[in-house]
Amino acid sequence: MKIYQCAFCGADIPPGYGIMYVKSDGTVLRYCSRKCFVSATKYGRNPRKLAWVRKLQRKQKQSTS
Protein backbone atom coordinates (compact mmCIF):
# COMPACT_ATOMS: atom_id res chain seq x y z
CA MET A 1 0.00 0.00 0.00
CA LYS A 2 1.20 3.45 -0.85
CA ILE A 3 1.23 6.29 1.67
CA TYR A 4 0.36 9.60 0.04
CA GLN A 5 1.08 13.13 1.24
CA CYS A 6 -1.53 15.82 1.76
CA ALA A 7 -1.49 18.39 -1.06
CA PHE A 8 -2.09 21.19 1.45
CA CYS A 9 -0.17 20.50 4.67
CA GLY A 10 2.18 17.70 3.62
CA ALA A 11 1.03 15.21 6.28
CA ASP A 12 1.21 11.49 5.54
CA ILE A 13 -2.13 9.89 4.61
CA PRO A 14 -2.45 6.19 5.51
CA PRO A 15 -4.37 3.88 3.16
CA GLY A 16 -8.14 4.20 3.53
CA TYR A 17 -8.08 7.74 4.92
CA GLY A 18 -8.33 11.24 3.50
CA ILE A 19 -10.09 12.85 0.57
CA MET A 20 -9.16 12.34 -3.08
CA TYR A 21 -10.13 15.36 -5.19
CA VAL A 22 -9.99 15.10 -9.00
CA LYS A 23 -9.92 18.42 -10.85
CA SER A 24 -11.60 18.86 -14.24
CA ASP A 25 -8.22 18.61 -16.01
CA GLY A 26 -7.60 15.17 -14.46
CA THR A 27 -5.15 16.25 -11.75
CA VAL A 28 -5.54 14.22 -8.55
CA LEU A 29 -5.08 16.04 -5.24
CA ARG A 30 -5.18 14.17 -1.93
CA TYR A 31 -6.04 15.82 1.38
CA CYS A 32 -5.61 14.37 4.87
CA SER A 33 -8.70 16.04 6.36
CA ARG A 34 -11.75 18.12 5.59
CA LYS A 35 -9.95 21.09 7.14
CA CYS A 36 -7.16 20.91 4.53
CA PHE A 37 -9.60 20.27 1.68
CA VAL A 38 -11.79 23.29 2.47
CA SER A 39 -8.82 25.56 3.18
CA ALA A 40 -7.32 24.77 -0.22
CA THR A 41 -10.38 24.58 -2.48
CA LYS A 42 -13.09 26.78 -0.99
CA TYR A 43 -11.01 29.48 0.68
CA GLY A 44 -7.87 29.34 -1.48
CA ARG A 45 -5.57 29.72 1.50
CA ASN A 46 -1.79 29.60 1.30
CA PRO A 47 -0.46 26.85 3.62
CA ARG A 48 2.79 28.75 4.24
CA LYS A 49 0.84 31.52 6.00
CA LEU A 50 -1.10 29.29 8.43
CA ALA A 51 0.36 28.64 11.87
CA TRP A 52 -1.23 25.18 12.29
CA VAL A 53 0.37 23.94 9.06
CA ARG A 54 3.82 25.16 10.08
CA LYS A 55 3.40 23.54 13.50
CA LEU A 56 2.42 20.21 11.90
CA GLN A 57 5.37 20.33 9.49
CA ARG A 58 7.81 21.04 12.34
CA LYS A 59 6.38 18.10 14.30
CA GLN A 60 6.78 15.76 11.31
CA LYS A 61 10.32 16.95 10.67
CA GLN A 62 11.31 16.23 14.29
CA SER A 63 9.77 12.76 14.23
CA THR A 64 11.72 11.77 11.07
CA SER A 65 15.03 13.02 12.47
Swiss-Prot record:
A molecular function GO annotation: rRNA binding
Keywords: Metal-binding, Ribonucleoprotein, Ribosomal protein, RNA-binding, rRNA-binding, Zinc, Zinc-finger
Pfam families assigned to the protein according to its UniProt record, in alphabetical order: Ribosomal_L24e
Segments forming C4-type zinc fingers: 6-36
Cofactor remark: Binds 1 zinc ion per subunit.
Transmembrane segments: none
Gene Ontology, cellular component aspect: ribonucleoprotein complex; ribosome
Protein role: Binds to the 23S rRNA.
PANTHER family in UniProt: 60S RIBOSOMAL PROTEIN L24, RIBOSOMAL PROTEIN L24
Protein family membership: Belongs to the eukaryotic ribosomal protein eL24 family.
Protein name per the record: Large ribosomal subunit protein eL24
Origin species: Pyrobaculum arsenaticum (strain DSM 13514 / JCM 11321 / PZ6)
